[in-house]
A protein has these predicted regions:
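Formylglycine-dependent sulfatase
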Residues: 1-214
Length: 214
């Protein structure tokens, strides 16, 4: 089983849901051959509670997961989604952000964040430069004249970064996931792959901006 999640991606930005500006060909191909949900709702309005909810199967308020923390102290020895597979003979791996992980801070540090160790056979993090990536950028908040330089933190900044995908967290995540899928093994797998974009900061290789520049 391959589970893929992106961070802060609203359905209204996807071509398969009618967006005519954004280009999402890979997601569109999945939609063409799978199920396209029109009434699926998030149980938590922000990152930590939402992820804790779908990984444990509980409402956020039922396990006191209202912040950015690991739900394990509240669920005790009850199995998470991936842990259920692990307990039944599956190889389970996490690549980057599945449970909560700070963006951009946690990605810059390359740590495990609020991950649940018991849920996985192996865990792989994908550190990246985030807003510090070399390139051209500016801060979008409170900057009507476009003169405020890029600054750190959980802020709306945009960086047209030098280099290719492998400079950044998501490029590393995709490469590691592909490597794990191709590895021969004697048991089935559950691989959770977490991409951190389009969560702020808006950092991507320069080539992805070209179609949208004036």
């Amino acid at each position: 089983m391959l589970f893929i999640i992106s961070d802060d991606l609203t359905y209204t930005t996807l071509s398969c849901y009618g967006n005519t500006v954004c280009h999402t060909p890979n997601i569109d191909r999945l939609a063409e051959t799978g199920t396209l949900f029109t009434k699926a709702y998030c149980q938590g309005t922000y990152c930590g509670p939402s992820r804790a909810s779908f990984m444990t199967g509980y409402y956020p308020h039922a396990i006191n997961a209202m912040g950015y923390k690991n739900p394990r102290p509240e669920i005790g020895n009850r199995a998470t989604w991936s842990q259920h597979f692990k307990n039944n003979g599956y190889y389970t791996a996490r690549v980057s952000k599945i449970f909560h992980m700070g963006v951009p801070g946690g990605i810059e540090e390359g740590g495990h964040g609020a991950d649940d160790e018991a849920s996985w056979t192996e865990r792989f993090n994908s550190p990246g430069p985030e807003w510090k990536a070399p390139g051209t950028g500016e801060t979008l908040e409170g900057n009507p004249d476009g003169i405020v330089p890029v600054k750190g933190g959980n802020t709306f900044v945009v960086v047209e970064a030098d280099g290719d995908d492998m400079v950044h967290s998501d490029g590393k995540t995709a490469a590691k996931a592909a490597e794990l899928i191709r590895q021969p093994r004697d048991k089935p797998f559950f691989i959770g792959v977490g991409f951190v974009r389009p969560h702020v900061p808006f950092v991507a290789p320069r080539e992805y901006y070209e179609d949208f520049l004036p």
